[in-house]
Amino acid sequence: MDHDTVTTFVEDAIEELEQRNALEEAEYLRMMLECDGPDVDGAVSSLVKYGAVTVAWVERLAAINEESVGFFDEELAELREGLSGA
C-alpha cells in the first residue's frame, strides 16, 4: 500500500470538506492525520455525509484498495453507497 496515496486521498478529502464548510470534520481529519495517520474511514464518512461523493472519489479509493489487497473494502462500499444515494 502506498502511504503517500492514502495520505493524499485524506488531504484532498479535507480540502473538499473545507470547501463545503464542514470545518469541524476537516479539522478532526487533519488532527487525526497529524497524530495517527490518515483516517480513510472518517474521510469517507464525511464525504458521504456532506454529499461530496463523485465517481472520481470512488475510482481513487478503488485504486488504493486494489493496491492494498482489499484493506479498504468497507470504506469503498460506503463510498459507492454514497454515490448511489447522491
Predicted regions and their residues:
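Short terminal alpha-helical segments
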Residues: M1-M32
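Acidic, low-complexity, intrinsically disordered interaction modules
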Residues: M32-F72
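Short, charged, intrinsically disordered terminal tails
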Residues: A77-A86
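Intrinsically disordered, low-complexity regions enriched in serine, threonine, proline
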Residues: L17, E27, W57, L76-A77
